[in-house]
């Protein structure tokens, strides 16, 4: 690939997209043309200079439960510098291969460890550790319920759920940390249908139930707007006269779904 700038950023939508392969291929061709190019990577998580079991790093494990990523101490970094740094299994496993490729291309490898390749300074940007820990625990819980939904829909198996249950245990996460969980379950039990709940910035918990025209998520958002705006329950933000023709168009004319809520 022809490049015109001294710094080239290679990005892609997710893991396994070929970012590293593209960079190493370019590195090889640059050296063949006499260009002394280099390679570094920005990977936000896990954060190398936070503890291995810090909630932020555990949240990364939760986010990649489907990939079965595991945070670990970088053994190459520890051997080279005598210092502990957090990395993850895929980077550690592939480093000997990368090292050999660098030596073949450049004559010598510029890196002593996979952590050396990173330019991540996110850990130094944390100004309130307690807030980050709380947000990480909520994210772990969210990932757990997402995995449970994916399993219920047949899009995933038991392994991601089991992995997330282990991460929750390590991070001291239970459903009780989020008041919306118990509120949604109670609403679903009392109404006999799917329900949702949300914690507002002021701590109030708002719920939403399934009706003939609205799903739980839609009802929840409308109820949250009413709560924030100080609008009483007796008022409808969207009249049934507005919703009914939309539902009829969807189910009877366009036939996009048998249910107006889908």
Name what the model sees in each region.
Residues 95-155:
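N-terminal leader/propeptide and maturation segments of large enzyme subunits in energy/redox metabolism
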Residues 143-180:
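Short, compositionally biased leader-like segments
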Residues 51-91:
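Conserved nucleotide-sensing/catalytic segment adjacent to the nucleotide-binding pocket
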Residues 174-193, 199-200, 204-253:
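Conserved mixed alpha/beta catalytic, RNA-binding, or beta-rich assembly cores of soluble enzyme
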Residues 255-260:
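Conserved small/polar residues in nucleotide/adenosyl-binding loops
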Residues 1-6:
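Extreme N-terminal, non-catalytic leader segments
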Residues 7-27:
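Glycine-rich phosphate-binding P-loop
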Residues 35-48:
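Short beta-strand-centered segment that lines the nucleotide-binding/catalytic pocket of NTP-utilizing
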């Amino acid at each position: 690939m022809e490049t015109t700038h001294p710094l080239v950023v290679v990005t892609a939508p997710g893991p396994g997209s070929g970012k590293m392969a593209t960079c190493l291929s370019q590195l090889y061709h640059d050296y063949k043309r006499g260009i002394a190019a280099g390679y570094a990577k920005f990977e936000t998580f896990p954060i190398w200079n936070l503890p291995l079991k810090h909630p932020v790093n555990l949240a990364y494990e939760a986010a990649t439960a489907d990939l079965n990523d595991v945070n670990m101490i970088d053994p190459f970094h520890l051997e080279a510098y005598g210092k502990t740094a957090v990395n993850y299994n895929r980077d550690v496993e592939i480093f000997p291969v990368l090292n050999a490729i660098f030596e073949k291309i450049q004559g010598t490898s510029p890196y002593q460890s996979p952590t050396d390749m990173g330019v991540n300074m996110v850990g130094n940007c944390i100004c309130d550790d307690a807030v980050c820990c709380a947000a990480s625990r909520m994210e772990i819980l969210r990932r757990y319920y997402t995995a449970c939904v994916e399993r219920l829909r047949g899009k995933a198996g038991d392994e991601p759920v089991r992995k997330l249950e282990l991460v929750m245990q390590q991070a001291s996460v239970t459903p009780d940390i989020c008041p919306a969980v118990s509120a949604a379950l109670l609403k679903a039990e009392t109404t006999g249908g799917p329900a949702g709940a949300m914690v507002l910035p002021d701590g109030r918990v708002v719920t939403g139930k399934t009706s003939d025209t609205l799903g739980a998520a839609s009802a929840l958002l409308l109820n949250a707007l009413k709560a924030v705006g100080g609008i009483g329950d007796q008022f409808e933000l969207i009249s049934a006269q507005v919703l009914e023709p939309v539902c009829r168009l969807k189910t009877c004319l366009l036939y996009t779904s048998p249910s107006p809520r889908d």
